[in-house]
Design a protein with these regions (language model features):
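Alpha-amylase-like alpha-glycosidases and glucanotransferases acting on alpha-linked glucans and related
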Residues: 1-102, 168-170
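Loop/helix patches that line or flank the sugar-binding groove of alpha-linked glycan CAZymes
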Residues: 58-170
Length: 170
């Protein structure tokens, strides 16, 4: 699904799946409460002011029908934006950005995603090569794809973005 999120232009630079409507703006503002809860290490008891001005704990913030924050200690939270399976954060953000989004803005958005993970309380989990804007060319199951999609050029001289079609879906 091409619905945008926090780093990919939701509301402020809509793609073909989003409209930049007032309802999307309100949803993004409400979703910022989740981001605040996650930056605090997912602490269930952490008190903060929501976008609506209410003072709540992280456990009172809804994330898809469950509490956004649930930990007693930030060390209980693993923070990540992408992992070893499925697309990299670079791949998925390329898919979700509006077509005309400049490369420099896409890179900044990817850096924001990585920065949130690194600066939030908790344990950061960084997918190998994320700092190099690593791509697996949208391969959702690269385990069976071999080195073509899984190798990392640590020099940063090459990229796998858009370098061939991913395997057929499982």
């Amino acid at each position: 699904v091409q619905n945008q999120g926090f780093i990919s232009g939701w509301f402020y630079a809509p793609n073909s799946a989003n409209s930049g409507s007032p309802a999307e703006r309100d949803a993004l503002i409400k979703d910022s409460d989740n981001i605040r809860a996650w930056l605090a290490g997912g602490l269930a008891g952490y008190r903060f002011q929501t976008a609506e001005g209410n003072v709540v704990t992280g456990a009172n913030i809804d994330y898809r029908g469950q509490p956004s924050a649930y930990t007693a200690d930030p060390q209980e939270a693993i923070n990540y934006a992408s992992k070893h399976d499925n697309e990299t954060i670079w791949d998925i953000s390329q898919y979700k950005h509006a077509t005309g989004t400049a490369l420099a803005e896409r890179v900044r958005a990817d850096n924001v995603a990585t920065s949130v993970i690194m600066l939030a309380q908790g344990i950061p989990f960084i997918h190998a090569g994320t700092e190099l804007l690593r791509s697996k060319s949208m391969d959702r199951n690269s385990y069976a794809s071999g080195d073509w999609y899984n190798e990392i050029d640590w020099t940063g001289a090459t990229s796998k973005w858009n370098k061939g079609l991913p395997r057929p879906a499982d």
